[in-house]
Every structure is written in structure tokens, then in C-alpha cells.
């Protein structure tokens, strides 16, 4: 499926933090180039919600303040909240643990206004008070007094993005050149 690019042999690969070589199927970076990572947490308008430290505070917003909240339209991220709040691993595959997480989420479903990725306009307009979202939202929105981001005290998720080349790609050499372009320090800094 993936082409072995040997991107790890490029001179600028030395700038990749070894901690970012986390993919079990590519521990040396022979296939893919890790280029970004982030967290999933809670964006909130502190002027509406008051301080938020975690998922329990987030899920209590509708009842406590009347403010609206949204969660991601992403089964894995939403289930992660249920698993965290029931004390289980976000990577659990145990049917009983998944059911307990589902039950927890269903208990709080009525307070969730929408499951969406379209958070930026909702939070900047004040239509919602808080949202489960990726940390990158802070670069998508205009500065708003009171807008905060927190990684929940109970726990959150982390993601990593990588550039890979398909084995069936017709332009493998250009794809590798693009990966090497991303490795340039002045480009990576952007």
C-alpha cells in the first residue's frame, strides 16, 4: 500500500524528534514523514462558562449556564471522552467498557447541541459556549477575549499527522521531493 521512501535518510530528517516516530509499522521513518501533532481538548468562552478544567465541567455547561456545547462528528474522539470518563483506555476494544462509555455519553447527549467539525464560526459568533475540538482551532479563529483551550484534567487524546506516498503513485520522485521540502527547517517552522 505504501511506498518505502527512505525519507529517514534525508539529511534534514535529523531534525525530526525521535519521540514523533511512534507508528508501530514505521518506527524508523522509512515510509512516512511525521510533520504535525496536536491534542483534542475543549475550547470555551470563559466569560460564558467560567473556568473549565475538564470533561465533567464541559458536559455540565448546558445545565449549569444554559450555554450550548458541541462535540466532534468523530466517533473515535467522542467515544474517547466516554472511555476517559469511565476510567478506561481510549484504545479499549472491550465490549463491556465500550458499552459503559456509550451509556455515559448517552446520559449527556441531550446537552450536546451538535456533533460537528464546523466549530470556528459557531464559537466566534457566540452561538456556542464551548466545543470539543483540535488545538489548531486557535489559528482558525480571530482573537476573542475570553476564548480559552484546555486539555481536560481527566485526559484527552493526541494525534499525529504524517505524509506518506502510495505504492501506486505515478510520481514517487516528486512526492519524495515534496517530503524533503517539508523537512527544510525554514519550511517546518511555518
What are the roles of these predicted feature ranges?
Residues 39-40, 47-50, 75-78, 136-139, ...:
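Solvent-exposed loop/turn segments at secondary-structure junctions
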Residues 67-71, 185-190:
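Bilobed periplasmic-binding protein-like "clamshell/Venus-flytrap" ligand-binding domains
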Residues 124, 130-146:
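A ligand-binding cleft/hinge motif common to bilobed small-molecule-binding domains
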Residues 38, 98-106, 143-169:
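Periplasmic-binding protein-like
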Residues 72, 131-134, 150-152:
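Short, conserved beta-strand edge motifs with alternating hydrophobic and charged residues
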Residues 39-48, 84-88, 159-174, 179-182, ...:
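A bilobed periplasmic-binding-protein/Venus flytrap-type ligand-binding module shared by bacterial periplasmic
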Residues 1-127:
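Extracytoplasmic ligand-binding site segments that recognize negatively charged/polar headgroups
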